[in-house]
Amino acid sequence: MGWSDEVDAILGGDLTAGLAYVTPAGGVVITPVAPIGLRDRAAGTVGFTTSFGFSKKLDRIKRNPKVALAYHARDHGFADGDLYVLVQGVARPVPQADPDHIRDVIGPQAAPFMGPPKQGFFWDRWLQAYYADRVEITVDVEHVLTWPGGDLVSAPPSQSPPKKGTRPRVKPLGMDLPHRLLGWVGEAGFPEVVPVDADAAADGTIKVASEAGLPAGERRAGLVAHDYNAQLIGLELRQHTGWLTADGPRGAYAPHTESKFKAPANKTLLLLANGFIARRGLKKARAAGTR
């Protein structure tokens, strides 16, 4: 699987991408990741890193390795232009933690994007779960879709409604952040992700619209809005899973779950928070026997 020079510049230059993975119920969760330019054009692979401390994401990918990465924002990266790139593929099995690989390969690869890592007696201990237990996830690329100029949306059949119904279950989070993505499971079983406009409606739903199109019918879907500064400092994230009803480029989204996060705008405070979250997640993963 190859791709153009224009696409390669985006895969190699974007600071963040939207990782979409499939839930056990057949929905999609979208979360920003830092791909730090990881890709092998000759081998047809892309990648990103994550920590064993964030085990739920890894568990979902292990259960269903069909994933997608939406390269949708040029902010604070090295690529230019407004081309939207959606890469769909199959994630390889999660490898064991390899601190030498992280230090010697991933560290230098990440430095232009994230800045040099904090080092020293305190930081080495505090960020152990975040850095030393970090792994590179490699994705064997199946499809590279671009927009404008290409189709991002297939024609998957409607899904059966959940037992608890399709109406909104939580109050919509504000979608007034610069970057918004909506995703669902496409006809081939891979997540499909499009950029959207999103506004809360009086009935508790979120009105969504995408010039790239939406799949006709009803289905589970994931929605995310996010913003970030250089080196992902000050990352703000608002996520929903829920139910999408669409016809043409417009639809109504009923939020069923919500999650939000706002990182400190100071890098030192951000790393302190990252270390705490990763250590807590790793402790839970070990207690559950998944690490």
What label would you give each PLM region?
Residues 2, 78-171, 209-291:
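Charged, gly/pro-rich active-site loop segments
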